[in-house]
Amino acid sequence: MFGKGGMGNLMKQAQQMQDKMAKVQEEIARMEVTGEAGAGLVKVTMTGSHSVRKVDIDPSLLEDDKEMLEDLIAAACNDAARRVEENQKERMAEVTGGMQLPPGMKMPF
């Protein structure tokens, strides 16, 4: 099935890919993205591990409806989470050469 040294090369390649994926996972955890809502009136900065680092609210919103502000904060959080997911997929595609992960498998593992 494998030529001379084929299995050894395959194992070496698998180890290299695993090392690259671990490095990318660390980079993803350290990255920060900012999600926005209300045309930038509410901004949420989130890490690659989905921890919210900062919430920025335009002062003009503090005089308005509390419920609207809550909705905008939730929307900005969701936008930031979506951006984290997009960045994770892009970075992992670079490592895996575009190979798709099985459905339901998320990165980092």
Swiss-Prot record:
Keywords: Cytoplasm, DNA-binding. Its main location: cytoplasm. Disulfide bonds: none annotated. GO terms for molecular function: DNA binding. It is found in: Cytoplasm, Nucleoid. One of its GO terms (cellular component) is cytosol. Binds to DNA and alters its conformation. May be involved in regulation of gene expression, nucleoid organization and DNA protection. Homodimer. Belongs to the YbaB/EbfC family. This is Nucleoid-associated protein Ssed_2851. It comes from Shewanella sediminis (strain HAW-EB3).
